[in-house]
Amino acid sequence: MLVNFSKMHGLGNDFVVIDNITQNVFLSRDQIIKLADRHFGIGFDQLLMVEAPYSPDLDFHYRIFNADGTEVEQCGNGARCFARFVRMKGLTNKHKITVSTKSGNLTLYIEKDGQVTVNMGHPNFEPSKIPLKATKRELTYIIRTEEHTVFSGAVSMGNPHCVLEVDDITTAQVDILGPLLENHERFPQRANIGFMQVISKEHIKLRVWERGVNETLACGTGACAAMVIGFIQNKLISTVQVDLPGGSLQIRWNGEGHPVRMTGPAEHVFDGQVAL
């Protein structure tokens, strides 16, 4: 069976996108892992599936699979690529696109300059919703490993995030602390780990160790998580530039009770076919 796909990226966070409306594709976990291999497959951080909506008041259903084959709740950079893909492939001509995901609904806006704004919904700081093992909600949590004690914020952006503030993003122990915290017992569903350097109240630098992927060039939900945690800790204002290794995103949030909005690029690289 030949499957049509597009390779896309958002600030270097790269995706294979499959139209599962005009095709009928089912991929096993082993097949996804094989396709994700950058030497023997296509190579990607996440695989995105475009599916028919589950509800008549939505345009599409959006599914996300990590490179390790696990289906996850949310991917912000992927959402921007999803929006560009469905327009590019003629699946819709709308500039405002509504989609369902495993963790809730998103609204995607195609901007005049070609960038995409995503209404990411409301952040959730309740430990049980992240999920994080904690007796109560805190601004900062103390998390201990055998050799390290870290102070972090935690939030769900539809998926679990832990954010650490660091003095210098270039020397942050991403490769050491990333996997330790991702798989820490206090995160029952594992977590994405952000390392945030505050440059000013409207500017941060960020590296993200993504759950099931390792460090990526960009993470949209990670950028949102870092911004909202910095905001509630009174370190950031309501509009922030987030510099990631792959480029910059603009994140806007007016505080609890309001949705987070993320704006950034979505790039098409090539189309192809793969035999399953």
UniProtKB/Swiss-Prot annotation:
The active site is at C75, C219. It is found in: Cytoplasm. Substrate binds at N13, Q46, N66, G76, N77, N159, N192, E210, R211, G220, T221. It catalyses: (2S,6S)-2,6-diaminopimelate = meso-2,6-diaminopimelate. One of its GO terms (biological process) is lysine biosynthetic process via diaminopimelate. The record marks H161, E210 as: Could be important to modulate the pK values of the two catalytic cysteine residues. Transmembrane segments: none annotated. Keywords: Amino-acid biosynthesis, Cytoplasm, Isomerase, Lysine biosynthesis. The record marks F270 as: Important for dimerization. GO terms for molecular function: diaminopimelate epimerase activity. Disulfide bonds: none annotated. Its EC number is 5.1.1.7. Pfam families: DAP_epimerase. Pathway: Amino-acid biosynthesis; L-lysine biosynthesis via DAP pathway; DL-2,6-diaminopimelate from LL-2,6-diaminopimelate: step 1/1. Homodimer. Belongs to the diaminopimelate epimerase family. NCBIfam families: DapF. Catalyzes the stereoinversion of LL-2,6-diaminopimelate (L,L-DAP) to meso-diaminopimelate (meso-DAP), a precursor of L-lysine and an essential component of the bacterial peptidoglycan. This is Diaminopimelate epimerase. It comes from Pseudoalteromonas translucida (strain TAC 125). The lineage of its organism: Bacteria, Pseudomonadati, Pseudomonadota, Gammaproteobacteria, Alteromonadales. The gene is dapF.
